Amino acid sequence: MAPRTPLALFVSLNLLFFTYTSATTGTCPKNSIEIGTCVTVLNLVDLTLGNPPVKPCCSLIQGLADLEAAVCLCTAVKASILGIVNINLPINLSVLLNVCSRNAPKSFQCA
């Protein structure tokens, strides 16, 4: 019978490394109230061109890569979660991403 020490060490190391890789991913918020905080960013940028309070909106997409953040916000805007009647998708999406110091990939289109 083979010793169990190498097998136990192998399983332990696999569990350890798997835990590290799966704990670092962000997710797109599914709560419409959370994503609705981004509306204030759009309204304040349109009205006051100053320094809008962006922390609530940017913190929602903080753990996401740029492409994931763009897809998340695009899906929210398209689903009318944000409650905006007349929206210009490319401009509003780029405003939200720029305010959060993010960039959509050049080939990305929110259609």
Swiss-Prot record:
Main location: secreted
A single BP term in Gene Ontology: response to auxin
Signal peptide: 1-23
Entry keywords, A to Z: Disulfide bond, Secreted, Signal
Disulfide bonds: C28-C58, C38-C57, C74-C110
GO cellular component assignments: extracellular region
Location in or out of the cell: Secreted
Induction statement: Induced between 4 and 8 hours after treatment with auxin and remains high for at least 24 hours.
Domain of life of the source: Eukaryota
Family: Belongs to the plant LTP family. PEARLI1 subfamily.
Protein name as it appears in the record: Putative lipid-binding protein AIR1
Organism, as annotated: Arabidopsis thaliana
